Amino acid sequence: MIIDRVEVETINSFSKLELLKEVYGLISILPILTLLLGITIEVLVIVWLEREISASIQQRIGPEYAGPLGLLQAIADGTKLLLKEDILPSRGDIPLFSIGPSIAVISILLSFLVIPLGYHFVLADLSIGVFLWIAISSIAPIGLLMAGYSSNNKYSFLGGLRAAAQSISYEIPLTFCVLAISLLSNSSSTVDIVEAQSKYGFFGWNIWRQPIGFLVFLISSLAECERLPFDLPEAEEELVAGYQTEYSGIKYGLFYLVSYLNLLVSSLFVTVLYLGGWNLSIPYISFFDFFQMNNAVGILEMTIGIFITLTKAYLFLFISITIRWTLPRMRMDQLLNLGWKFLLPISLGNLLLTTSSQLVSL
């Protein structure tokens, strides 16, 4: 009986241990699930904002019937795409055709790992955070090229080639701008870059220390997002819908999601690298330093930091949406000339000047 009792206690202890492991596993993925929910809500808000701002610019009525103020219009459109038939090209490469959208979405979602939304509210505070983002974002054009090649359609193939060429042309100036920011901050961690801008308040932001780099980064980010006037890979008048021509249903919805996710990531990185992240514009004196630090105060500080970060990001979103409905589309040769003959030399010169100033200050 003693042996049986010991065995029962051992089994119970193991079952409790397994239960604790399951609970710990659920708790560990809770931040990721929260971030995914936040990203989904942000994308819906961006879609609604773009439609409202576009309607205001064009002096017309935007979405107003689906929910109050048309807030549910994006959900209605997404539901419609999910319920549509997923048509596959009869002579296309089906495996590549199916993998292409997934690669583009996953590569952009991984970029959120290194974005600090609030005070130390980041999933992975890595010492190479900004360069990890550049490496991950370089994978997305591969998915677009695969989508264009596998569709067995000349318009899709040309759209995929344009997407790859455009990404290569503007990835290099963008990288040089990030290098200059890393030199100024003495770190490649996104959290360290934000904290380095908090010392002098509004005038400590990198937008004042790197005005040329900011303009180059802004233009390169718009080109990476393939937004007007840089939407050559999916120009309707020339390529029908570019690499998206043969897609329908949920796969087309994924490409639609990619464009807005890319815009959101670019907006957040403009905020983190140049606009001080979660910091206010006043010299850094934390209001919460006057209170005893506890969980409630920490959560409140983090929440306010997230609000400040998103407010700054929406400024870039407003600029990009306004540019879309203001400037005409560029030709392909003009787009490549802008990237290779103007932005690349300017960003390289900015990097050399930053390096020289840092060496002199040593």
Curated annotation (Swiss-Prot):
Reactions the enzyme catalyzes: a plastoquinone + NADH + (n+1) H(+)(in) = a plastoquinol + NAD(+) + n H(+)(out); a plastoquinone + NADPH + (n+1) H(+)(in) = a plastoquinol + NADP(+) + n H(+)(out)
PROSITE patterns linked: COMPLEX1_ND1_1 (PS00667), COMPLEX1_ND1_2 (PS00668)
TM helices/strands, residue ranges: 29-49, 103-123, 128-148, 164-184, 202-222, 247-267, 303-323, 335-355
Lineage: Eukaryota, Viridiplantae, Streptophyta, Embryophyta, Tracheophyta
Designated name of the protein: NAD(P)H-quinone oxidoreductase subunit 1, chloroplastic
One family name in Pfam for this protein: NADHdh
EC number(s) given by UniProt: 7.1.1.-
Subcellular location: Plastid, Chloroplast thylakoid membrane
An annotated GO BP: photosynthesis, light reaction
Record key words, sorted: Chloroplast, Membrane, NAD, NADP, Plastid, Plastoquinone, Quinone, Thylakoid, Translocase, Transmembrane, Transmembrane helix
The gene coding this protein: ndhA
Matching InterPro entries: NADH_UbQ_OxRdtase_su1/FPO, NADH_UbQ_OxRdtase_su1_CS
Subunit structure and binding partners: NDH is composed of at least 16 different subunits, 5 of which are encoded in the nucleus.
